[in-house]
UniProtKB/Swiss-Prot annotation:
Domain annotation Glutamine amidotransferase type-1: ranges: 13-205
Entry-linked HAMAP family: GMP_synthase
EC top class named in words: ligase
Pathway named in the protein's UniProt entry: Purine metabolism; GMP biosynthesis; GMP from XMP (L-Gln route): step 1/1
Record-given protein name: GMP synthase [glutamine-hydrolyzing]
Pfam (any one): GMP_synt_C
InterPro entries the UniProt entry points to: Class_I_gatase-like (IPR029062), GATASE (IPR017926), GMP_synth_C (IPR001674), GMP_synth_GATase (IPR004739), GMP_synthase (IPR022955), GMPS_ATP_PPase_dom (IPR025777), NAD/GMP_synthase (IPR022310), Rossmann-like_a/b/a_fold (IPR014729)
Residues holding ATP: 233-239
Superkingdom assignment: Bacteria
The keyword Ligase belongs to this UniProt entry's keyword annotation: yes
Its biological purpose: Catalyzes the synthesis of GMP from XMP.
Entry annotated with the keyword Transmembrane: no
Keywords in alphabetical order: ATP-binding, Glutamine amidotransferase, GMP biosynthesis, Ligase, Nucleotide-binding, Purine biosynthesis
Amino acid sequence: MSNISTDLQDVEKIIVLDYGSQYNQLISRRIREIGVFSELKSHKISAAEVREVNPVGIILSGGPNSVYEDGSFDIDPEIFELGIPILGICYGMQLLTHKLGGKVVPAGDAGNREYGQSTLTHTPSALFESTPDEQTVLMSHGDAVTEIPADFVRTGTSADCPYAAIENPDKHIYGIQFHPEVRHSVYGNDILRNFALNICKAKGDWSMDNFIDMQIKKIRKTVGDKRVLLGLSGGVDSSVVGVLLQKAIGDQLICIFVDHGLLRKGEADQVMDMLGGKFGLNIVKADAAKRFLDKLAGVSDPEQKRKIIGNEFVYVFDDEASKLKDVKFLAQGTLYTDVIESGTDTAQTIKSHHNVGGLPEDMQFELIEPLNTLYKDEVRALGTELGMPDHIVWRQPFPGPGLAIRVMGEITEEKLETVRESDAILREEIAKAGLDRDIWQYFTVNTGVRSVGVMGDGRTYDYTIAIRAITSIDGMTADFAKIPWEVLQKISVRIVNEVDHVNRIVYDITSKPPATVEWE
């Protein structure tokens, strides 16, 4: 299996070197909001490799390391000699200070560790153009810079940090001790915009319209006269991929809709009617519910579920592809967040993603992932740009493994039915309350926990259903949605009264992090 992903070599970009910060993906996202493409790169990247990528700017992210410790994340010093503007954030500022001859002291030695919001006072600088001389920023550091490198000047201070911002304007190297990428830094977006547009001289013309043109050319060049298989789940991601591919290669696209028995209520019919009917996609429906459920029988481990579903999904594709000629490619709706969440060299794997892990090495296809550089909100914007209606573009996200990862423990038909019916009620009531565009994602989970209840005059011992609803911008971080109590109460009453084998409803009030969006 080979992987053909989005080629962005010719796109003007700013790269973010990943030093393990919990915020490093947000840096990339904020730069994109400015209209400049941005992506994460390993901190191990060499100067020669940076030259090949040809970015207009480089950002060194924050991170948990200390520059004076053995094994701390480093940087190729030749990167500083490439003539490319550089912005170091938090650990990134400490690292560039350390490498260029300044001094960084351990936490506490200088008595100036800072955690939380602080007031930054700055002097004139291209980085702070059109921002107030005093502004609120988020600090999160223990170590501190006490001496700056030669040819650098101090441009910002705070009450506990004498070197909150430094720069070498001649070499276009900048360092800031605070985090401009988070909303707590009130003028953070303006600072990043100054770096991207004024210092790096980026044009700011990254858009979904440009992305469509670029992707269509790339897809046509890659595919040639061969045929492409796409797995349709009915979700936003695969639907957008389908419309994009059809626009690029027309009848060369064959969509396979695998009904694995793990779909939401009425979803199979909706997929066939919506994408096969309205958009005219060539869809082959594979009824494989028994095949999947037999393989999943007795399996409780979430990672094993994902691997089984990933394998079986592709094997079904193999079966369908064997009936066709000139099928060379398999398309997937993998997003940038999927790739990040499956682990980098600075972070442990949280969980394998269904579009990243679980694919057998002997699969017959080459993999095409047209969306694997995009965040979720960018995919929705892409769908709108492609002419897709809101009810498709804003459809609730649904994972490839389907309800298998919304049923805790072993999967049974009874558990699946409780999730299907409760989820349908949740979606209906959220829409009635006018909250369906305000809440980023919402669904129900069979927790696998049974509890005692009373219905009528009888004792019950039935399942507990959890409601998960979150607000987010890009899926990298999320807060639980503050759904009005009266709406939650109505949902709870309906589920308990209308769904068999359920007698208790709980609401998940955990943010991401520490939790992920899905329960498994």
